[in-house]
Amino acid sequence: MKTPLTEAVALADSQGRFLSNTELQYLYGRLRQGAFALEAAQTLTAKADTLVNGAAQAVYSKFPYTTSTPGNNFAADQRGKDKCARDIGYYLRMVTYCLVAGGTGPMDEYLIAGVDEINRTFDLSPSWYVEALKHIKANHGLTGDAATETNNYIDYAINALS
């Protein structure tokens, strides 16, 4: 999985050299940012159920047909609602993985690479997940650098879905 740290090391190694002072300073900054990112991942994990359920409600409010249309791809019954929450939870987990990894590698490899095919195969609307992510962004309760780090990854996911 690619992260800013692994990419810097791979580049230096491919060139047969040690990391430069500039690269080391950048990596030191990334590691310092890591404390904020870990705090954010911890908070999001602790609030995951509340955030996911609130995000699902936001989707149902903005797209009421999702709860009135019968079928495997909608939330008209409890099974459908459980699937919706599961899928939103997956996006939230990807955000926490990116926070821990310090880059978009987890999202790139495990989500974005196949999201179009998954949505097309199962007839899922990306706009549902965009709405869910916007709700999470507006309600995660993080501040400062932790919020900035988190919002960057949420925005990355939103842009990939848009």
From Swiss-Prot:
Gene3D superfamilies: Phycocyanins. This is C-phycocyanin subunit alpha. SUPFAM superfamilies: Globin-like. Keywords: Antenna complex, Bile pigment, Chromophore, Electron transport, Membrane, Photosynthesis, Phycobilisome, Thylakoid, Transport. One of its GO terms (cellular component) is plasma membrane-derived thylakoid membrane. Its main location: membrane. It comes from Picosynechococcus sp. (strain ATCC 27264 / PCC 7002 / PR-6) (Agmenellum quadruplicatum). It holds the Pfam family Phycobilisome. PANTHER family: C-PHYCOCYANIN ALPHA SUBUNIT, PHYCOBILISOME 32.1 KDA LINKER POLYPEPTIDE, PHYCOCYANIN-ASSOCIATED, ROD 2-RELATED. (2R,3E)-phycocyanobilin binds at C84. It comes from the Bacteria. It is a peripheral membrane protein. One of its GO terms (biological process) is photosynthesis. Belongs to the phycobiliprotein family. Contains one covalently linked phycocyanobilin chromophore. CDD domains: PC-PEC_alpha. Light-harvesting photosynthetic bile pigment-protein from the phycobiliprotein complex (phycobilisome, PBS). Phycocyanin is the major phycobiliprotein in the PBS rod. Heterodimer of an alpha and a beta subunit, which further assembles into trimers and the trimers into hexamers. It is found in: Cellular thylakoid membrane.
